Amino acid sequence: MNIIGIDPSLNSTGWAILSVNDNNYNEIRLVNNGSILTSNKKTIGERLNKIYSELLNILNSYKVDTASMEEIFINKNPKSSTLLCYARGILLLTLDVACIPLFEYSANRVKKSITGNGHAKKEQVCFMIENILNIKCYGTYDISDAIAVAICHIYSIKAF
């Protein structure tokens, strides 16, 4: 089964494809990851279109079965929250167009499932990702956050 974890952002949407063995949920493998980058010099419509088209291409290329994303949170800055909502909206639309079910988790649940601590720092989450997947946690936090939410989803499936 292929699961995509998504960390939404209008500037840099992180994504990670994890593959898990249907018979052994402890066999988790990182297939690929990256960021969908948009320029703030473009219109919001152009930026959302880029997120839509790139994510749709990723979903089709990797035959994704399910998606996971952190639940929305409201930032103290209303403009930042609004831009995040735009990005989330286009991500939800893209997943719906591709007929991929979405599972959402709170940030605290993601951190707790990965580290055992719902208030863990990003460095602690990266450390655990390295141990779980036997990889070097590199790149930006948008990618590690995407990996973390995908692992959280796998652990949630495994619990049932």
Swiss-Prot record:
Keywords: Cytoplasm, DNA damage, DNA recombination, DNA repair, DNA-binding, Endonuclease, Hydrolase, Magnesium, Metal-binding, Nuclease. One of its GO terms (biological process) is DNA recombination. Mg(2+) 1 binds at residues 7, 142. Mg(2+) 2 binds at residue 70. The gene is ruvC. Binds 2 Mg(2+) ion per subunit. Belongs to the RuvC family. It catalyses: Endonucleolytic cleavage at a junction such as a reciprocal single-stranded crossover between two homologous DNA duplexes (Holliday junction). It comes from Ehrlichia ruminantium (strain Gardel). The RuvA-RuvB-RuvC complex processes Holliday junction (HJ) DNA during genetic recombination and DNA repair. Endonuclease that resolves HJ intermediates. Cleaves cruciform DNA by making single-stranded nicks across the HJ at symmetrical positions within the homologous arms, yielding a 5'-phosphate and a 3'-hydroxyl group; requires a central core of homology in the junction. The consensus cleavage sequence is 5'-(A/T)TT(C/G)-3'. Cleavage occurs on the 3'-side of the TT dinucleotide at the point of strand exchange. Homodimer which binds Holliday junction (HJ) DNA. The HJ becomes 2-fold symmetrical on binding to RuvC with unstacked arms; it has a different conformation from HJ DNA in complex with RuvA. In the full resolvosome a probable DNA-RuvA(4)-RuvB(12)-RuvC(2) complex forms which resolves the HJ. It is found in: Cytoplasm. The active site is at 7, 70, 142. PANTHER family: CROSSOVER JUNCTION ENDODEOXYRIBONUCLEASE RUVC. It holds the Pfam family RuvC. Its EC number is 3.1.21.10. It comes from the Bacteria. This is Crossover junction endodeoxyribonuclease RuvC. Its main location: cytoplasm. GO terms for molecular function: crossover junction DNA endonuclease activity; DNA binding; magnesium ion binding. InterPro entries: RNaseH-like_sf, RNaseH_sf, X-over_junc_endoDNase_Mg_BS, X-over_junc_endoDNase_RuvC. One of its GO terms (cellular component) is cytoplasm. Its cofactor is Mg(2+).
